[in-house]
Amino acid sequence: MSKKLTFQEIILTLQQYWNDQGCMLMQAYDNEKGAGTMSPYTFLRAIGPEPWNAAYVEPSRRPADGRYGENPNRLYQHHQFQVVMKPSPSNIQELYLASLEKLGINPLEHDIRFVEDNWENPSTGSAGLGWEVWLDGMEITQFTYFQQVGGLATSPVTAEVTYGLERLASYIQEVDSVYDIEWAPGVKYGEIFLQPEYEHSKYSFEISDQDMLLENFEKFEKEASRALEEGLVHPAYDYVLKCSHTFNLLDARGAVSVTERAGYIARIRNLARVVAKTFVAERKKLGFPLLDEATRAILLAEDDE
């Protein structure tokens, strides 16, 4: 490995690379979420027949993973670089390996393994065939071919590549703690994120108002349903994301039992499924505008028969 890229240079390099492969560069979605997969740029766009190629950085919050900034590798919030390509290119793995070369990682000089790890997200009714990518014994990426999203079978299949940016940067910069990662020249990761990490951990585990969170979950659930009754997919999905994050806060606080946990997940999943079905129906009303004319004509004609 030659130059040790800063965290922001890693992002810029991946953005330029995937832009060159035909991906749109999206921006992080402005609602809390546990993974880049939950962004509407993946969750909604992975369903239906329209093509979609996008790449974006997604800050991902997982309250139960907070460790007050005392653990060098486990975080309340981490950053994912998300790539979604639909339909999936036949050479997606080769494209991924080439992206590592752009980061200064020569696949011929390192032990890179694709370890089978099929993926499932019960709260959104999503699943797919997947692999973890291990670089010299450390997981740096999750590869997934979506088979189902929001309870709907995917056709065409979407390929998702999710880089764990903190892990990747730790490897490239050869540091043992994420807080020692150089974000930009002269600025360490910890100088930006250590204090928020501590505060969010303290809030999630000790301070959050359980009664308020329980009440908020009910309100967000009702508002999502109300928006769906009007066919308003995106506002509804925003409230699904709010339900998910609120549940994660309750879970971190130990406010839900094992039985209740399954019930909350089912409620979020049911909403996500309705959002998915409504999104495809609304795109159909628009004539699936991202399809080429020939494919659009065939699909719409089939539906008219």
Swiss-Prot record:
Looking at the UniProt record for this protein, which Gene Ontology cellular component terms does it annotate, in alphabetical order?
cytosol
**Locations listed in the record:** Cytoplasm
Coarsely, its chief localization is: cytoplasm
**The keyword Nucleotide-binding belongs to this UniProt entry's keyword annotation:** yes
**Reaction equations catalysed:** tRNA(Gly) + glycine + ATP = glycyl-tRNA(Gly) + AMP + diphosphate
What GO biological process terms does the UniProt entry carry, in alphabetical order?
glycyl-tRNA aminoacylation
The molecular function terms in GO held by this entry are: ATP binding; catalytic activity, acting on a protein; glycine-tRNA ligase activity; transferase activity
Could you say which EC number(s) this protein's record lists?
6.1.1.14
Instruction: Report the CDD domains cross-referenced here.
Output: GlyRS_alpha_core
Keywords, in A-Z order: Aminoacyl-tRNA synthetase, ATP-binding, Cytoplasm, Ligase, Nucleotide-binding, Protein biosynthesis
Q: Name one Pfam family in it.
A: tRNA-synt_2e
Identify its protein family. Belongs to the class-II aminoacyl-tRNA synthetase family.
Give the PANTHER family listed for this entry: GLYCINE--TRNA LIGASE, CHLOROPLASTIC_MITOCHONDRIAL 2, GLYCYL-TRNA SYNTHETASE
HAMAP family xref list? Gly_tRNA_synth_alpha
Subunit composition and interactions:
Tetramer of two alpha and two beta subunits.
Output this protein's name: Glycine--tRNA ligase alpha subunit
> Which lineage?
Bacteria, Bacillati, Bacillota, Bacilli, Lactobacillales
